[in-house]
Amino acid sequence: MCIRDRYGRYCYVQNKSESDSYKVKIIMKKMNISNLSKKNFSYLSDGEKQISLIARALIKKPRILILDEPVANLDYKSKFFVIDKVNELSKLNTKILCVTHDISTITKIYDRVIMLKDGKIIADGDQNMVINSENLKNLYGIRVEVTNNNGLWNIKRLIK
């Protein structure tokens, strides 16, 4: 089934309105995936699949978009493709709640970071306060060096 049909089917199941086909076109254009509309989902790269699934969720204009590990198991090219698209979304009126274990992909688009360990909050605040060597040692039990390069985090394990 091609991407456009997957969106159409989703809209149909959710009480498709007359304007849903137009919404699909607009969202695909906004997410820069119009060129994928006739491709079979199973032939897309993992990054393209992630973006198309995010786009599908946006059709109904949610106030909050929940992303669970949006860049897990992606190669670097696909990771940055997804990160760039999420960055674009952050400029719209959609709030984004992102769950991730990959701290290096937390970008400047997230204005609040909550760090959990065993279901308890161990740090909460803006990312410059939360993402630091002390909190990461507490979270993972290893010593690391943390740097931020233009909004992208670099975490390097330190030898004991």
Per-region residue spans from a language model:
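A short, surface-exposed alpha-helical micro-motif characterized by mixed small hydrophobic
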Residues: 106-108
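H-loop/switch region of ABC-family ATPase nucleotide-binding domains
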Residues: 100-101
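Catalytic Walker B motif of ABC-type/P-loop ATPase nucleotide-binding domains
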Residues: 65-69
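Conserved ABC ATPase signature
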Residues: 40-44
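Conserved ABC ATPase "signature" region
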Residues: 19-36
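ABC ATPase nucleotide-binding domains
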Residues: 139-160
